[in-house]
Amino acid sequence: MEIHQITDFNAPELDVYARLTENQLVNRADPENALFVAESPLVIGRALDAGCAPVSFLMEQKHIEGKGAALLARCPDVPVYAAELDVLTQLTGFHLTRGMLCAMRRPKLRDPAVLLQDASRVAVLENVMNLSLIHI
């Protein structure tokens, strides 16, 4: 496991957690490289179970051996960026209530024809700015 102690807030590998907007993460111009950030151990675990590929973890130092250990064991080749909670709060601009984040590759969108072939109901949502909030 590759653990990096955060010493430089401007390190480009931390951009996904500190400086990129949701629209930049979605990256419509290059969907193969689109990302999302999973925001708790439960969400990270579910995303891994669904086949999402992790890019990196941002984690409170104490969780490397604690509640993050099982997740990290599942992803031994994924870099971990760690610091104390106050440093992470300064970096992200908010308090990490569960002590960890994980940048993950956004899954490819499924073919609408396949999704609709057995559907008995269809909902059309307009002007949605953040797809992760509707849990599709």
Where are these regions (language model features)?
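Short, glycine-rich nucleotide/cofactor-binding loops
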Residues: 31-37, 122-132
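Short beta->alpha connector loops
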Residues: 41-42, 63-64, 107, 129-130
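Short beta-strand/turn micro-motifs composed of small residues
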Residues: 59, 104, 125
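S-adenosyl-L-methionine/SAH cofactor-binding core of RNA-modifying enzymes
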Residues: 62-119
